[in-house]
């Protein structure tokens, strides 16, 4: 706790414009709860903007962190895997108090194909379609028949086979 505050003060004194604080230690990795008290202590100790990170899995979590810590911004990590809509959901909830509807299966399918297409453009087909396997698992988590879809996706080796599986 005091180490985070000390480091943030040093960064501020060196002219840093903002700091991001993760409320979890390296030793914790993903276990246990993020300690939002650390984020709050840093926010109270410095004048520069503080970005809070740790255990933001929903719009409600984002609001709770902002209210509890007073942080100026939020950083979302694991909750964005397979859920790029979370940023819009958080923004909408913070503005209106209403959580938008989850994307439809069709919207998820279209996003998977767009994501894969962009990844292929960036990394090439061979690498991209293999990397998409884990992304597809994240995108489809909790959807009906997702276990069978994930099994089939683990066999994809080309853009064509990926499209065939996703569009079927």
How should each PLM-predicted stretch be described?
Residues 3-18, 30, 37, 41-52, ...:
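Alpha/beta catalytic cores of nucleotide-metabolism and tRNA/nucleoside-modifying enzymes
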Residues 21-31:
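Glycine-rich, proline-tolerant flexible connector loops at the mouths of alpha/beta enzymes
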């Amino acid at each position: 706790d005091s180490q985070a505050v000390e480091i943030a003060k040093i960064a501020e004194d060196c002219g840093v414009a903002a700091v991001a604080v993760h409320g979890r230690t390296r030793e914790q990795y993903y276990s246990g709860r993020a300690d939002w008290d650390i984020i709050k202590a840093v926010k109270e100790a410095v004048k520069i903007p503080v970005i809070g990170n740790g255990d933001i899995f929903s719009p409600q979590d984002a609001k709770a962190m902002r209210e509890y810590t007073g942080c100026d911004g939020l950083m979302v990590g694991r909750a964005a895997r397979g859920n790029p809509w979370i940023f819009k959901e958080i923004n909408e909830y913070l503005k209106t108090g209403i959580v938008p509807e989850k994307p439809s299966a069709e919207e998820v399918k279209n996003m998977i194909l767009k994501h894969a297409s962009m990844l292929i453009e960036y990394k090439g087909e061979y690498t991209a379609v293999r990397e998409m396997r884990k992304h597809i698992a994240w995108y489809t988590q909790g959807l009906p028949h997702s276990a069978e879809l994930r099994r089939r996706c683990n066999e994809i080796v080309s853009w064509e086979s990926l499209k065939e599986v996703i569009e079927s």
